[in-house]
A protein has these predicted regions:
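Solvent-exposed alpha-helical segments and adjacent loops
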Residues: 25-795
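Sec-dependent N-terminal signal peptides
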Residues: 2-25
Length: 795
């Protein structure tokens, strides 16, 4: 069939358009059409600013979860700086269920100060309820309270995994940003009930926020320090390479370790920090810290003039101005330590590209258990001192989110058979409609504690004085009372408050419709509320490697590590020094304070005689290899293990704290030789000081140290470290308890006696009988003496 010539000329421009095929990325439909589905042809990229929704085809054997959108399918891929963060990376590790009442979810993300976002996009994955009305139901996407787009829910998408691409306005992106999703759902056209169970949308944690932009070259000005080496807006793990000219001396290693603890104290528990070490070689990318003394500068700064004292200098690489070097220089090793101390304590005075340190002087010593990251245990603590961000104690809405507070406590806090922890709780709330059904629930570590009715008060304020129940090892109490699970001391505890309001939202009767505006319900916990851990003793059974992995105990008992000695190998290589920096940096993460008082030694005979806790890196000293407490020995490729009766980490932790002083004798001894990465963490008592501990990070080769680095900087793997020995392999971590318990801390004599006899009822009964007989004998003697005095009075 031939076409008229005029019509041919009209159709000719259409032939130049790209032909859509199966590999083309789905993009936005025209506003008048429903969202593009997988079996529909894709439109042109010109409409990329509109959302694209893709529903799974039921005829295809697709998985139940949507496939992630490929990074190369978005328009910002050409920018030199790229970042893709899933909702799980932004703190929402589980899917979020939006409902008719709780219909909004907020995701927060930050951008480094030396990055400029030029393009942004949201790859949204969600599953809508199959009962929703299409078109009327939709999702609104806000960026920093500005509406970005609306994602309609079509009939073909109901009950199926859906992917939608939403363009975000990069001009609105700053240092701190909030991405908010709001669900507008309808299941019928008349007489809706907002709390109906069919109103829901499941937002997947695999949804991704993509950013593209360019790095910004910062000026060489130390007034911005610790930028660009550490930026609190960067949620990624801190990785800060350290460069030495050659094998550093012991004092240079200490200076680098103190610096690592300072950066670790800022990194925080969830971010963690690593410090790769190299000799006279810069890393291929990123910033770095360079240590040097006169006459021994690394080759990258070989032309630098000699310094006349402790100096901290910020400079750029000539070949790449965006990369910065932090030079820590001095005339000798003592100058390096002074410079690092000034970096940690006095960087508020820094300005310019070069800072010369005149003096650093400590004025007051630290006290035990005063780590900034730990709660005070010498007085009641106000909730205001526990806040992580403003407005943390305030919620609003008909079904508000829970209020949470994080409590980080010393692991040796002794709460055995205590009545509870005093909690003075003050709260305010909007008077509910139904007082009989509105309540405030209190939980800790996801374990229910108590609840209080929310009634109509004149002052709209409540005051409750309760005690958080705790249990020790006496879980088998026979008094018939309800046993509430124990507050787990030593790791991160979370106190949660749930305001549950009972409100009348309207009528769902089809013959009697009522329109009711949702009430603006608000609630708040007063910042003057207190929790009191004072009066508790400090006493713990060791070895307990979970206390080391989760709290840095016993080293972090003194926040500045002034009672810690680290034993390092003589002539340590780069992997061993990197392990030192990562370990001490990890202790800074736990305590939140730099290790000003840290001591290093490469002489075991000298270190073991010091009244301090020992952290041993590398191979164990010869004098410890024959110790009865040693349950694992690594000798190059040969390893010897004493197997105990406790194979699981959970039981190992319970056994380490159960209060039994009896030995857990090994069952068998196994020795093998293998050529593969293998490392271990071993805990034991100091041979010369019974109140001191030794923790050994045992490794023989560079690949073994990589296992230790990975375990100590991974939050999930830290949780598996427990007992007296933890074995690290490429397959994971195996922990067990073998050997004897020893105890550090102090208790009153009567409590000490009662605690250690609690697991031995027969011995306790015999002791009680002896005490009764002795008391009866003394009473008999006293009465006999009184009677003799009465019958034979003296003149």
């Amino acid at each position: 069939m031939s076409l008229p010539t005029s019509l041919r000329w009209l159709l000719l421009p259409l032939l130049a358009l790209p032909i859509a095929n199966g590999s083309s990325a789905p993009v936005a439909p025209a506003p008048a059409r429903p969202a593009t589905t997988a079996d529909q042809p894709a439109s042109t990229p010109a409409a990329a600013s509109l959302p694209v929704a893709v529903a799974s085809d039921p005829a295809l054997p697709a998985s139940t979860t949507p496939s992630p959108v490929q990074p190369q399918s978005w328009r910002g891929q050409a920018w030199p700086w790229q970042r893709a963060s899933s909702f799980a990376d932004l703190g929402r590790r589980q899917d979020v269920m939006l409902s008719g009442v709780r219909n909004a979810a907020t995701y927060e993300f930050q951008v480094r100060r030396d990055r400029l976002a030029r393009d942004a996009e949201l790859d949204l994955s969600f599953t809508p309820s199959p009962a929703l009305l299409p078109t009327l139901s939709h999702l609104r996407v806000f960026l920093n309270d500005a509406l970005m787009d609306v994602v309609p829910i079509s009939d073909s998408q109901l009950g199926k995994p859906v992917q939608a691409k939403v363009a975000l306005d990069a001009r609105l992106i700053g240092d701190f940003n909030q991405l908010r999703l709001e669900f507008v759902g309808h299941y019928t056209d008349i007489c809706e009930e907002p709390t109906h169970s069919s109103l829901w949308v499941n937002v997947a944690s695999s949804s991704v926020v993509r950013l593209g932009g360019q790095p910004l070259a910062m000026q060489d000005d130390l007034a911005n320090f610790p930028l660009p080496f550490f930026d609190p807006r960067d949620s990624a793990r801190l990785e800060l390479p350290v460069v030495f000219a050659s094998t550093p001396s012991l004092q240079q290693q200490r200076a680098a370790a103190v610096m690592a603890s300072y950066f670790g104290s800022m990194a925080g528990w969830w971010r963690q920090a690593r410090f790769p070490v190299s000799f006279d070689t810069l890393p291929e990318k990123g910033h770095a810290v360079v240590f040097g003394v006169n006459g021994k500068f690394p080759s990258i700064i070989a032309g630098h003039a000699a310094v006349q004292g402790p100096v901290i200098e910020l400079t750029s690489l000539p070949s790449d101005p965006e990369r910065k070097l932090l030079l820590v220089l001095g005339r000798n090793d003592a100058d390096l330590q002074t410079a690092v101390a000034a970096m940690a304590a006095g960087n508020a005075l820094f300005r310019g590209s070069v800072v010369k340190v005149d003096e650093v002087k400590s004025l007051a010593p630290r006290k035990p258990y005063d780590a900034p990251n730990w709660m005070r245990t010498d007085r009641a603590v106000r909730f205001a001192d526990l806040l992580d961000y403003p407005q943390q104690l305030r919620v609003q809405g008909v079904s508000p989110q829970p209020i949470t507070l994080n409590l980080n406590l010393p692991p040796d806090l002794f709460i055995w058979r205590n009545q509870g922890i005093p909690l003075n709780l003050r709260y305010r709330y909007t008077p509910p409609f139904n007082s009989d059904e509105s309540r405030l629930g209190v939980s800790i570590n996801d374990q229910f504690i108590s609840s209080f009715p929310l009634i109509k008060r004149t002052g709209k304020q409540g005051l409750e004085e309760i005690r958080l129940p705790v249990m020790g090892s006496d879980a088998g109490s026979g008094d018939g009372s309800l046993l509430i699970p124990a507050l787990k001391i030593g790791n991160r505890n979370q106190l949660r408050f749930d305001f549950n309001f009972a409100s009348v939202m309207g009528s769902a009767q089809r013959d009697h419709c009522q329109t009711t505006l949702p009430p603006n319900l608000q609630a708040a916990i007063e910042e003057d509320s207190t929790i009191d851990f004072s009066g508790f003793h400090h006493y713990i059974g060791l070895p307990d490697l979970s206390a080391f992995a989760l709290s840095g105990f016993p080293f972090t008992r003194m926040a500045d590590l002034s009672e810690t000695v680290v034993l390092v190998p003589p002539q340590a290589n780069a992997a061993q020094i990197g392990m030192l920096l990562n370990a001490v940096g990890g202790l800074g993460v736990q305590s939140g304070y730099p290790a000003y008082g840290l001591r290093l030694s490469d002489d075991w005979k000298q270190a073991v005689n010091l009244d301090a806790d020992l952290l041993v890196l590398g191979t164990l000293p010869e004098s410890l290899r024959g110790s009865d407490q040693l349950s694992l020995l690594i000798d190059n490729q040969r390893s010897t293990l004493l197997n105990g009766r406790v194979p699981s980490p959970q039981t190992a932790v319970a056994d380490a704290r159960q209060g039994s002083s009896a030995a857990d004798a090994p069952i068998n001894r196994v020795a093998v030789t293998a050529d593969a990465p293998f490392a271990a963490i071993i805990g034991m008592q100091s041979p010369n000081h019974p109140q001191r501990s030794i923790v050994s990070l045992a490794a023989a080769q560079s690949s073994d140290y990589a296992l230790l680095d990975d375990a100590l900087t991974d939050i999930g793997k830290r949780a598996a470290i427990a007992g007296s020995v933890s074995i690290l392999r490429t397959s994971g971590i195996h922990s067990q308890f073998v050997g004897e318990h020893y105890y550090v801390g102090s208790l009153p004599w009567w409590l000490l006696l009662w605690y250690h006899l609690a697991d031995h009822p027969a011995l306790l009964a015999v002791l009680a009988m002896v005490v009764v007989l002795l008391a009866a004998f003394l009473l008999w003697r006293l009465l006999r003496w009184v009677s003799l005095r009465r019958l034979n009075p003296e003149p």
